Amino acid sequence: MEITSVNHICFSVSDLNTSIQFYKDILHGDLLVSGRTTAYLTIGHTWIALNQEKNIPRNEISHSYTHIAFSIDEEDFQQWIQWLKENQVNILKGRPRDIKDKKSIYFTDPDGHKIELHTGTLKDRMEYYKCENTHMQFYDEF
């Protein structure tokens, strides 16, 4: 018995139509279905579910590093930055990053969910940590 992959990612959103437009137009998601309070899209091979919940607190989300990261090609990195700026997306400062840790840009969706576009892979990250973080214990070889 094993878990084979991430099945889907679900975001609570305050305005379904605004969020559909963001994920469709900004992140090039393919809209599969939308209803009164739910929509499903795919971004790459990832299923994204949006569920509208209008009356819940949303202020804590900005204090967390919790985020979803999508892979992009390094040669497209600057083009993505320009695209996000042209579309008035809220780009975040991000954390200091060594070039060996590859490139990332962080931004938020209309409800403040943090999203990262990252040029590296898990293998890149593990190799970087092995070189830079001697305090870490590694369990599998990459």
Swiss-Prot record:
The protein's assembly and partners: Homodimer.
Family as reported in the entry's similarity comment: Belongs to the fosfomycin resistance protein family. FosB subfamily.
Name assigned to this protein: Metallothiol transferase FosB
HAMAP family noted in UniProt: FosB
Domain VOC as annotated: residue spans: 5-120
Nucleus in keyword set: no
GO cellular component, one term: cytoplasm
Keywords, sorted A to Z: Antibiotic resistance, Cytoplasm, Magnesium, Metal-binding, Transferase
Chain positions recorded as Mg(2+) binding sites: H8, H67, E116
Compartment(s) where it occurs, according to its Swiss-Prot or TrEMBL record: Cytoplasm
Function: Metallothiol transferase which confers resistance to fosfomycin by catalyzing the addition of a thiol cofactor to fosfomycin. L-cysteine is probably the physiological thiol donor.
Active site: residue positions: E116
Alphabetized GO MF terms: magnesium ion binding; transferase activity, transferring alkyl or aryl (other than methyl) groups
Enzyme Commission number(s): 2.5.1.-
UniProt record, GO biological process: response to antibiotic
Pfam family, one: Glyoxalase
Cofactors that this protein relies on: Mg(2+)
Gene it is expressed from: fosB
